[in-house]
Amino acid sequence: MAAQNEQRPERIKTTPYLEGDVLSSDSGPLLSVFALQEIMQKVRQVQADYMTATREVDFTVPDVQKILDDIKALTVEQVYKIVKVPSISFRHIVMQSRDRVLRVDTYYEEMSQVGDVITEDEPEKFYSTIIKKVRFIRGKGSFILHDIPTRDHRGMEAAEPEVLGVEFKNVPPVLTAEHRAMIQSALDGSIIENGNVATRDVDVFIGACSEPIYRIYNRLQGYIEAVQLQELRNSIGWLERLGQRKRITYSQEVLTDFRRQDTIWVLALQLPVNPQVVWDVPRSSIANLIMNIATCLPTGEYIAPNPRISSITLTQRITTTGPFAILTGSTPTAQQLNDVRKIYLALMFPGQIILDLKIDPGERMDPAVRMVAGVVGHLLFTAGGRFTNLTQNMARQLDIALNDYLLYMYNTRVQVNYGPTGEPLDFQIGRNQYDCNVFRADFATGTGYNGWATIDVEYRDPAPYVHAQRYIRYCGIDSRELINPTTYGIGMTYHCYNEMLRMLVAAGKDSEAAYFRSMLPFHMVRFARINQIINEDLHSVFSLPDDMFNALLPDLVAGAHQNADPVVLDVSWISLWFAFNRSFEPTHRNEMLEIAPLIESVYASELSVMKVDIRHLSLMQRRFPDVLIQARPSHFWKAVLNDSPEAVKAVMNLSHSHNFINIRDMMRWVLLPSLQPSLKLALEEEAWAAANDFEDLMLTDQVYMHRDMLPEPRLDDIERFRQEGFYYTNMLEAPPEIDRVVQYTYEIARLQADMGQFRAALRRIMDDDDWVRSDGVLRTVRVKFFDARPPDDILQGLPFSYDTNEKGGLSYATIKYATETTIFYLIYNVEFSNTPDSLVLINPTYTMTKVFINKRIVERVRVGQILAVLNRRFVAYKGKMRIMDITQSLKMGTKLAAPTV
């Protein structure tokens, strides 16, 4: 029984290399991993040499499937939360007074604890702290009120106290009955009104909320109240067009009843995606290519043609000496099959992936392999006209191989008249003197290869993605035609194939001509399938834009390097024969196909958020240069990357390009205007608008040094002292008089430190009861409360650090202005047993640091003012209403099987 209950290990699915006529089954993500490995082999050759002299880089190939799963998880992530009560914006600290309390704005109290301490020499930490504070604002204010707790008061609906955003439960126990009745009367007046927002019934009430948080809440509420009906219609209409292009029916399942009166819906993402957002990312061409393969390429099998074709044409005789007959019965190895995959990847991504010949001494010594590859290579690949599958070197090598094959007289001799140039194929052959020069590669016209006298790139009806309007037509085949493999291709032909048959007959290669004539239907089905895959499945935001596609071939010929250079993959000679004898037959559509538009939208949205963050951080560097003395643009690039979702970083860095992005790449990307609209982007921009006031981030440059005695009042009347609610703070109500303030810049401080007079100068200013301000430096501010004497490091702490040391007979001084500053509140508590001098010390206690922030963080208020902060309008959705995120409806529905598959 134990043996039966023992779980069997899960079988790992592997890709078979040879099962009858079917060679292998490759899915999109699997092919993307393979393509990424091969592409990275080429990319690393340059990168590794460059990095040898600098630093080590992790070149491990990332898991593409895991990255896709992580991005899918981002599509269901909500940037808002649905709550019953808003967060507490104001709390109260009870003192010994019966009619006075301290009201604390909890936003500033919590914000002061967010992030690290800012210093002058760590700009990356400064940027990271700013981003954390901005994200705190966005997260704190991104809430939707739903089903708030209410109570009945004399037939009217009133809000429960916890809904108002003010925490005061600790106040009533210390109040008199008269004051408690006054507060209760104010609470009874918090009536909830019925409202109507976008034809939906809602509750409207007045509550309390801090200004930065309310800005985010208001932006979110405005986003919802705007309904976005037109955006939804545009998205659905675009999905219908995309579904028609990709043979996918759009599902209305999620949208069945979203228009009902009891439903509030939120559309967090929009379609179509702005392709400029994706393609503006620096050094992103390889990453976008891999994402295109992973999200769109179908699962398929490599199918061999009918074996009778070769048996009745090439191997019909007992003795076979021709190169084709020799290779007919060969079986590919695993490495050769990998080369076949590369060939089909190059055919599916013309121009983006091009092929070159692998240096293999063994195959170069085998003339039969080279000659066969020279013939089939001219029928498999396109070299010029509008795009190319080959490098110039490979095209020339194929020309030389075809030249050798035509001159290989193994059956009968034919007449050959050589031309004057000595170039490959510069001769006329046969009785009719066929001019073989036409098969020599010409990248300007495409002669000699599949693009010869063929319209292989077409622009017709507008495509869903505006940046990729082209339609690829290998061999002149229209991808709109339906394919029946049993009959398709019969009677079809194209110019290059016809000319190849004519040339083979002229050269006396009748058996080979018969073989190619019989292979023509199989060959046409092959390229018809490839055309359909390119024009339907692979059409994506990750498709290469038309302007870049059109520039690939001219740049390749001219040797110019642009943003989207083609990737060169090496293949062996014999793999061309195996690729010609096998066709990629799609069996299943890619499982990511219907969710791909949503993945593209969330990726573009995250990129837009990153771009907005970097723009504001770069602006910040110009606003406060003194706190960012050693800052470089690369610092805010790294800070934004560190706080971005891991999945988005992984996609951007699929080819490890982040190690090679320079300042020019980054600043060019940041200054480009393209953005992808989304709810997250709208809230991020609003959060940055709130963060423009640095005091809302609990950062300030108005920190003063001033000697002040800690109050030590006499307790002559303890009852009166308690009723006043006595407290002390180093927070200033207003800046000091300007004529009593000495502005201390870095230059002044350094000069006096060099003269050894820094402390003496400050002492003289303090003795004159003046103030010292350190100019232009932002400082991190913390807020703390004490009911006993604060520690000495807070009381006597200075708003700068000054260290001196001696080394080698020289004195060194270090001055830092950017230090942590603490705003403290000391609440005095006394008992009736205290004597009049209980708070008096023989030696006074001094405080040295004063802070001015133009915000009401803490204030002493009377009991009647506790609810005076209820001045914000809130909209809450009724409990019987449904709040529905319809972002998931932006997925296409059921994939239709391709006809005749």
From Swiss-Prot:
Q: Check the record and name the Pfam families matching this protein.
A: Orbi_VP3
Where does it reside?
Answer: Virion
Question: Among the entry's GO cellular component annotations, what is one?
Answer: virion component
* Alphabetically ordered keywords of this record: Virion
UniProt KW Ligase keyword:
no
Q: What is its main location?
A: virion
Molecular-function GO term, any one: structural molecule activity
Annotated InterPro entries:
Inner_layer_core_VP3_Orbivir (IPR002614), Inner_layer_core_VP3_Reovir (IPR016029)
Transmembrane domains' residue ranges? none
Q: Which family does it belong to?
A: Belongs to the orbivirus VP3 family.
What role does it play?
The VP3 protein is one of the five proteins (with VP1, VP4, VP6 and VP7) which form the inner capsid of the virus.
- For this entry, the protein name equals Core protein VP3
Say which species the protein is native to.
Bluetongue virus 2 (isolate USA) (BTV 2)
